[in-house]
Curated annotation (Swiss-Prot):
Annotated CDD domains: HFD_H2A
Protein family: Belongs to the histone H2A family.
Modified residues (N6-glutaryllysine): 96, 119
Modified residues (Phosphoserine): 2
Annotated GO MF terms: DNA binding; protein heterodimerization activity; structural constituent of chromatin
GO BP annotations, alphabetical order: heterochromatin formation
Protein name according to UniProt: Histone H2A type 1
Positions where N6-lactoyllysine occurs in the chain: 10
Chain positions with N6-succinyllysine modification: 10, 96
Length: 130
């Protein structure tokens, strides 16, 4: 008899997700699965889904921060599609990235052409200067 049956065997370490290893909130494993299933390439490297998840997380955080600011400017505590639209269209780079995207229930940016505004007369200008 060897007597090894009662000794504590090797306990398996707690599983650590690739998202937590990379310090991300977005699911690296799911992104990897979608890259494999999407027929983008025959093979997918180990770093590609981590990088893509990080980029998606950064863009999401950027849009949500700007939308939160837009909601706060409108004295609201909940972000609605209108706030997302205002956030994206008022940011030059995000507007370029999402130029062809329609946000449902987003509305349009308030804009009045300068030629449609009433002309300032001389009497109004002199009254303001006094």
């Amino acid at each position: 008899m060897s007597g090894r049956g009662k000794q504590g065997g090797k306990t398996r370490a707690k599983a650590k997700t690739r998202s937590s290893r990379a310090g991300l909130q977005f699911p690296v494993g799911r992104v990897h699965r979608l890259l494999r299933k999407g027929n983008y390439a025959e093979r997918v490297g180990a770093g590609a889904p981590v990088y893509l998840a990080a980029v998606l997380e950064y863009l999401t955080a950027e849009i949500l921060e700007l939308a939160g600011n837009a909601a706060r400017d409108n004295k609201k505590t909940r972000i609605i599609p209108r706030h997302l639209q205002l956030a994206v269209r008022n940011d030059e780079e995000l507007n370029k990235l999402l130029g062809g995207v329609t946000i449902a229930q987003g509305g349009v940016l308030p804009n009045i052409q300068s030629v449609l505004l009433p002309k300032k007369t001389e009497s109004a200008k002199s009254a303001k200067s006094k």
